[in-house]
């Protein structure tokens, strides 16, 4: 099971209410601030200003996998949570309004990463451990294609309909979902690409390499517009870039996570024209 915490105002993290009987703790799954589905919408709107209600903690039932959960993402419309896990390899979709599982699907191979291609769960792309990229629709598996090298990360450029696949190669593979075919790859100077991300503000694509470098691509020109080595000292020479994230306000700040556990921030507005 997973917890869904309320947003809003100032504060602390919600906790599950519990009582103890003969030394055995009993937890209230819904908590005292649970609002039944039949409560009037007007009443629910008034609760938005209730700080205690906003800090409530509710459980999403059945959000678990036999061995481990590998990825969790929320759909852009905020209505669904999609999770992948092992073993066996599978994905599950949960509806937040009902706090329960909507459906699950079993996969042939372990899911390395996945992307939500639309506003909800109706269009999904899965990068799997057997080098396959599996496209799913509401009714299930739609199409599958293999990339040349082992995939490591996935990103989607909604402006060009390009699905970007980072792999154990210097090439960033491009699958155009509108044309249904591979396009010319974006070539990086790194020997292999660990992670790829895209800014929702200006569309710049950033790749993190095994050599500790971050390289940015302009999807309009389909070429590199800048590259920087994130190693700040001789102690960081062997580090790899393992995580990237643009800020969601202006897109000028890029957070870079490394294999040695350090997080650095890069200002990249000079790359945006």
Which positions does each model-derived feature cover?
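Structural hallmark of WD40 beta-propellers
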Residues: 79-82, 120-125, 143-144, 152-153, ...
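WD40 beta-propeller blade core
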Residues: 92, 133-134, 173, 215, ...
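Canonical WD40 repeat/beta-propeller blade segments in eukaryotic WD-repeat proteins
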Residues: 68-73, 109-116, 149-157, 191-198, ...
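A short helix->beta-strand "capping" segment at the edge of beta-propeller domains
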Residues: 45-67, 95-103
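Short loop/turn segments that connect beta-strands within beta-propeller blades
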Residues: 96-99, 137-140, 177-180, 219-222, ...
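Conserved strand-to-loop turn within each blade of WD40 beta-propeller repeats
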Residues: 85-87, 127-130, 166-169, 208-211, ...
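Surface loop/turn motifs at the tips and blade-to-blade linkers of beta-strand repeat domains
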Residues: 62-66, 104-108, 144-149, 186-189, ...
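Blade/loop signatures of beta-propeller domains
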Residues: 30-56, 86
């Amino acid at each position: 099971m997973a917890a869904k915490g309320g947003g809003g105002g100032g504060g602390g993290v919600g906790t599950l209410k519990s009582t103890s009987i003969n030394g055995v703790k009993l937890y209230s799954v819904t908590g005292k601030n649970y609002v039944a589905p039949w409560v009037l919408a007007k009443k629910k709107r008034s609760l938005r200003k209730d700080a205690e209600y906003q800090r409530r903690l509710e459980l999403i039932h059945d959000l678990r996998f036999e061995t481990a959960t590998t990825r969790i993402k929320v759909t852009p419309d905020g209505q669904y949570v999609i999770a992948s896990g092992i073993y066996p390899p599978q994905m599950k979709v949960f509806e937040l309004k009902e706090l329960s599982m909507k459906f699950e699907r079993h996969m042939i191979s372990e899911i390395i990463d996945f992307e939500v291609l639309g506003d909800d769960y109706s269009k999904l792309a899965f990068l799997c451990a057997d080098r396959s990229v599996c496209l799913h629709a509401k009714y299930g598996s739609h199409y599958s294609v293999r990339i040349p090298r082992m995939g490591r990360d996935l990103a989607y450029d909604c402006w060009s309909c390009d699905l970007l696949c980072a792999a154990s190669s210097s090439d960033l593979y491009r699958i155009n979902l509108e044309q249904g075919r591979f396009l010319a790859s974006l070539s990086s100077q790194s020997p292999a690409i660990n992670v790829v991300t895209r800014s929702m503000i200006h569309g710049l694509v950033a790749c993190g390499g095994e050599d500790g470098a971050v390289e940015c691509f302009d999807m309009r020109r389909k070429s590199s517009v800048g590259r920087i080595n994130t190693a700040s000292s001789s102690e960081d020479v062997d580090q790899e870039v393992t995580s990237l994230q643009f800020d969601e306000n202006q897109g000028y700040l890029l957070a870079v996570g490394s294999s040695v556990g350090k997080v650095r921030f890069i200002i990249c507005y000079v790359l945006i024209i």
